[in-house]
Amino acid sequence: MQFNIQDIIKMLPHSYPFLLLDKVTACVPNESATAIKNVTFNEPFFIGHFPNNPVMPGVLIVEAMAQACLVCVMSDSKCNFENYTIYFMSIELAKFRKPVIPGDILTIEVNVIHKRKDTCRFQCFARVDQALASEAQILAMIKKN
């Protein structure tokens, strides 16, 4: 499955300036997803991080990973964000290996590595030009509203 920005807007509860995915290039519901974030100099966070050396904050890279995890789960035809809420319970083993700067295309890959009835653990990677920029494990709980 692939999703354009209009699909993502319908699937996620986020909106500008906190919607951090531009498209999903591959998705197997409840298994994996690959998403793209086009990093531009117009991002509001670059105003202060850092004015003379713009770098995407690591916490926003992790947030982009979390949004890709949400797409992975919400792309299941039985789910939608109006009926379910996903709570992120933990971020573990986060590592930031390469700065992400304006002009970069951030490719985010998420894989479900463990799933129980109402929780999922994801292994997440963010790459720029195939070089690993960051990685983390995210644990999420899925609750019906």
From Swiss-Prot:
It is found in: Cytoplasm. One of its GO terms (cellular component) is cytoplasm. It catalyses: a (3R)-hydroxyacyl-[ACP] = a (2E)-enoyl-[ACP] + H2O. It is an enzyme of class 4 (lyase). The active site is at 49. Its EC number is 4.2.1.59. GO terms for biological process: fatty acid biosynthetic process; lipid A biosynthetic process. PANTHER family: 3-HYDROXYACYL-[ACYL-CARRIER-PROTEIN] DEHYDRATASE. Involved in unsaturated fatty acids biosynthesis. Catalyzes the dehydration of short chain beta-hydroxyacyl-ACPs and long chain saturated and unsaturated beta-hydroxyacyl-ACPs. This is 3-hydroxyacyl-[acyl-carrier-protein] dehydratase FabZ. It comes from Ehrlichia ruminantium (strain Welgevonden). The gene is fabZ.
